[in-house]
A protein has these predicted regions:
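Residue-level recognition of well-ordered beta-strand positions that form the cores
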Residues: 100-102, 158, 171-173
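Active-site donor-binding loop signature of nucleotide-sugar glycosyltransferases
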Residues: 13, 159, 200
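Glycine-rich, charged/polar anion/phosphate-binding loops
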Residues: 153-161
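C-terminal accessory segment of soluble enzyme catalytic cores
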Residues: 179-258
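Conserved phosphate/anionic-ligand binding catalytic regions in large, soluble enzymes, centered on
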Residues: 163-176
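Short, acidic Gly/Pro/Ser/Thr-rich loop/turn segments
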Residues: 55-56, 164, 179-181
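N-terminal lobe of the biotin/lipoate ligase/transferase fold
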Residues: 1-154, 205, 239-258
């Protein structure tokens, strides 16, 4: 059966994490409603963006567990959010390409429908991109994410699947900017692992926006789906996405300058 395309949208401005999370929840609810009322009518989408500085904790951590860290990290000027994704404490911010695929895994068949297989495909997208676009060799790891050596992590993966619909996703360090923020925490609960970026690994200046076309192409290749840009005015999904884009129109930090 020919599967419908995956739409994608690349935000041109840095988006606060909480606002992007609210968008994901709205899209998830829309997909669930449309799938119930008109099966196969709902659209899958890949959101690509940068966040303003934020530390996020995974669903296994609680307010009590993170109270001291929250106070310390917010004093540095970052937001702090408890998220309903897998994984532990991590950082998002400028210089990092974040991807939120909102997909219906029930559209796939067999073992590919499972969460583990989905996570493996996300990691494959990132590994392919790093190898083909930058000549970087990734290292298999028992830990979730993408590594350039046993102790050098360049990308994180943390997902949530409800009713077969995915939220959250991946974050890939592009410039050196995220590394300073990572240096203030034990990221992902791995004290012996350091955060690296494409820029630090290659020794060449990188721009986040330049990574988007390659990630989109390889995402479609691994998922075996056509990738189509989300056009403004093309239904409820587009309305939700472009409303958020307009909301942060005045944000000084844009992907074109990163």
């Amino acid at each position: 059966m020919l599967l419908p395309p995956i739409y994608y949208h690349h935000f041109q401005r840095c988006i606060p994490y909480v606002r992007a999370l609210k968008l994901q929840e709205a899209i998830h609810a829309l997909q669930l409603q449309q799938r119930s009322e008109f099966p196969a009518s709902h659209q899958d989408i890949l959101l690509l963006l940068q966040h303003t500085p934020v530390y996020t904790a995974g669903r296994r951590q609680t307010e009590a567990d993170t109270a001291q860290e929250r106070a310390r990290l917010t004093a540095l000027g970052a937001d702090f959010v408890l998220a309903q994704r897998g994984g532990e404490l991590t950082d998002h911010g400028p210089g990092q390409l974040v991807g939120y695929p909102l997909l219906d895994l029930e559209r796939t068949s067999g073992a590919a429908r499972g969460t583990r297989a989905y996570v493996e495909r996300l990691q494959r997208v990132l590994a392919l991109h790093l190898g083909e676009a930058h000549g970087l060799v990734t290292t298999p790891s028992e830990h979730m994410g993408v590594f350039l050596g046993a102790r050098r992590k360049v990308a994180s993966v943390g997902v949530q699947v409800r009713h077969g619909l995915t939220t959250h996703g991946f974050a890939m360090n592009v410039t050196r900017e995220p590394l300073g923020w990572f240096g203030r925490v034990v990221a992902c609960g791995l004290p012996d692992v350091e955060a690296v970026s494409i820029e630090s690994a290659t020794g060449r200046e990188q721009r986040v926006g330049s990574e988007v076309p390659g990630i989109v192409e390889r995402f479609g290749r691994v998922m075996e789906r056509e990738m189509v840009p989300l056009e403004e005015g093309s239904g409820e999904l587009a309305k939700l996405v472009h409303t958020l884009e307009q909301e942060f129109r005045g944000n000084e930090r844009t992907l074109s300058s990163s």
